[in-house]
Amino acid sequence: MTISPETLAKSILDGFHSHYRRFQVLTQGARERFLKRDWTAVVSAASERIHYYDHQVGTTAKKVERRVGTELDEGLWLATRQRYQQLLKFHPQAELAETFYNSVFCRVFDRAYFNNDYIFVETVLANHIPVPVENECHSYFPVVDGLEGTLTRVFEDIGLGGEFENFENDIEQLRDKFFERATETDIEAHNLRIDVLKSPFYRNKAAYIVGRVVTENNHYPFIVPVLINSQGKLYVDAFITRSDRMATIFGFARSYFMVETEAPSALVRFLKDLMPHKTLAELYSSVGFHKQGKTEFYREFLHHLRRTDDQLSAAPGVKGMVMTVFTLPSFPYVFKVIKDRLGGTKEFGRQTVIDRYRMVKRHDRVGRMADTLEFVDVALPLKRISADLLDEFKQTIANSISIEGDTLVIHQLFVERRMTPLNLYLEYANDEEVDAAMDDYGRALKEMMAANIFPGDMLLKNFGVTRHKRVVFYDYDEVRYLTDMSFRRLPENDWEVSYAPDDVFPQQLAQFAVPQAKYRNKLLKRHPELIDSAYWCRVQKNIRKGELTDVFPYDADLRFTRRF
């Protein structure tokens, strides 16, 4: 039976609507999980939301296959793409629906057809009628209600749903911090507007209120974290201003927020205004639309290639035994491809590496593990690949590449934000920077432990330093759940030592991970418990009991004083 472009386009769009409804249901549950302090459910929902996209793409792709087969009818699909484009003109999630169409098409057909004739390599939404940013926020005018009255209205409207521990104290502290910031920026409370996004941003054990202060000549971002105590009472924890601090909270090493929105593009435009250095890819990912983040990243990369002429080359640092890593010097990312033969004594294979990278993707990254984007069949112009890198490809990842004319296709790769490897950073750092970096390295280990992550290979080369001087882990091939490991104290006599595959002896960790004594001593001065097996076992025990340690994405000195 012949199918019309109209029917085919609507069938794919129906698949997208099913996905988005499920996405919204999982997101809407964030408030109840927060109020119930059901942190286990928080983790499960975050993982399910990431997984569900691929499930719905697969379901829709099978329906398409049943109707049209896997042999491409060029006329039908050219017309289907055109009709689908028309359906999106007034669609509130148009950019996400474009990406969903691409995912379905690419699941069904050969990569030879992955071009702008059949899919949306480039967006066609330039003429799309965007949902106004104002659709996503409420505006308040302190000249009418006064600052305290305005702040009270913000909390009433946003609907957190719980009772506050000491609401009057929270409002007073917010007011004081607001006036402190107003003095710094020379603004007056009666001469401004406050815009607040309608829905709270939920992540881990906190809800965040996000907004901006708009004056005649400027605007200023702010974010208000709200926590919940052991009795289920809410309290405001801080009033955070400055774009760089907000960027850290929305950082690439953190889990995705859950925030309700009918118009993601409007939400992202609001956030982009507050954090102009963030890319669209980063912002879409940060609010849970990670597939849209991939789409935006790929478009950014293609545009960057057209504007530049530098060559892809090996990434700086010690070469790993599992991944071939390369970069484009003018583009702030690294590309990682699993080697054909894993080096050293690695007792696992390719699929284990893939599974572990995906595990981290779904897990709470607590600001200490870089997000990854996974791509298949990525086409790169051969002329942009240096001769040395091409030779390295042929020697290490020959099974993962193919050359088609003037294009090199990588069949699977992972992308991460480029950072300065910690071992290289330390070589050029001054004493103060070394102290801070080794302290933060220890904090990173502890925070990953608290999130039930054992990094496995803790060598300094597997950690990077961000532009905010934060230490972040990025090498996941040996990652395990902390609760799967057995932490033991070393026997006094060597002959008494016996090893099982999951055994770890913390007394040896510092020496193995940080062989240079000058760095190791600084680490152990700040974090001596890292070589105490009892400490690791205590953390393990707490995790098994469902007790999650608080890890705040902002400095402790920004936190409010609680008054009961």
Swiss-Prot record:
Its EC number is 2.7.11.5, 3.1.3.-. GO terms for cellular component: cytoplasm. One of its GO terms (molecular function) is ATP binding. Disulfide bonds: none annotated. It is found in: Cytoplasm. It catalyses: L-seryl-[isocitrate dehydrogenase] + ATP = O-phospho-L-seryl-[isocitrate dehydrogenase] + ADP + H(+). Keywords: ATP-binding, Cytoplasm, Glyoxylate bypass, Hydrolase, Kinase, Nucleotide-binding, Protein phosphatase, Serine/threonine-protein kinase, Transferase, Tricarboxylic acid cycle. The active site is at 371. Its main location: cytoplasm. Belongs to the AceK family. Bifunctional enzyme which can phosphorylate or dephosphorylate isocitrate dehydrogenase (IDH) on a specific serine residue. This is a regulatory mechanism which enables bacteria to bypass the Krebs cycle via the glyoxylate shunt in response to the source of carbon. When bacteria are grown on glucose, IDH is fully active and unphosphorylated, but when grown on acetate or ethanol, the activity of IDH declines drastically concomitant with its phosphorylation. This is Isocitrate dehydrogenase kinase/phosphatase. The gene is aceK.
